Swiss-Prot record:
Miscellaneous comment as given in the Swiss-Prot or TrEMBL entry: When the channel is activated, one or more imidazole moieties of His-37 probably become bi-protonated.
Ranges for region Disordered: 59-88
Known partners and oligomeric status: Homotetramer; composed of two disulfide-linked dimers held together by non-covalent interactions. May interact with matrix protein 1.
Protein name, per record: Matrix protein 2
Species of origin: Influenza A virus (strain A/Swine/Colorado/1/1977 H3N2)
Superkingdom assignment: Viruses
UniProt record similarity statement: Belongs to the influenza viruses matrix protein M2 family.
Keywords: Disulfide bond, Glycoprotein, Host cell membrane, Host membrane, Host-virus interaction, Hydrogen ion transport, Inhibition of host autophagy by virus, Ion channel, Ion transport, Lipoprotein, Membrane, Palmitate, Phosphoprotein, Signal-anchor, Transmembrane, Transmembrane helix, Transport, Viral ion channel, Virion
Domain observations: Cytoplasmic tail plays an important role in virion assembly and morphogenesis.
Molecular-function GO terms, alphabetical: monoatomic ion channel activity; proton transmembrane transporter activity
Broad class of the protein's primary localization: virion
Amino acid sequence: MSLLTEVETPIRSEWGCRCNDSSDPFVVAASIIGILHLILWILDRLFFKCIYRSFEHGLKRGPSTEGVPESMREEYRQEQQSAVDADDSHFVSIEL
């Protein structure tokens, strides 16, 4: 037997809830959270590519260098380049 048939029963010509505690604050909060979750899930599925494409490009840019002195930036670039150049016979790709 499904949960739907156990919770809701046909009353005259409409569907109604058998539970008397539908005004309970926890029931109302759970209903609101459930509806919001459903809406967010649908939006996530509809706009999946738009949402996650920005994350993908943002992460591939590398760490932020805002506020870092130029000498430290150059040192970081040299470390990354030396890691790539460690083995000249094979191409090494490092993504942060």
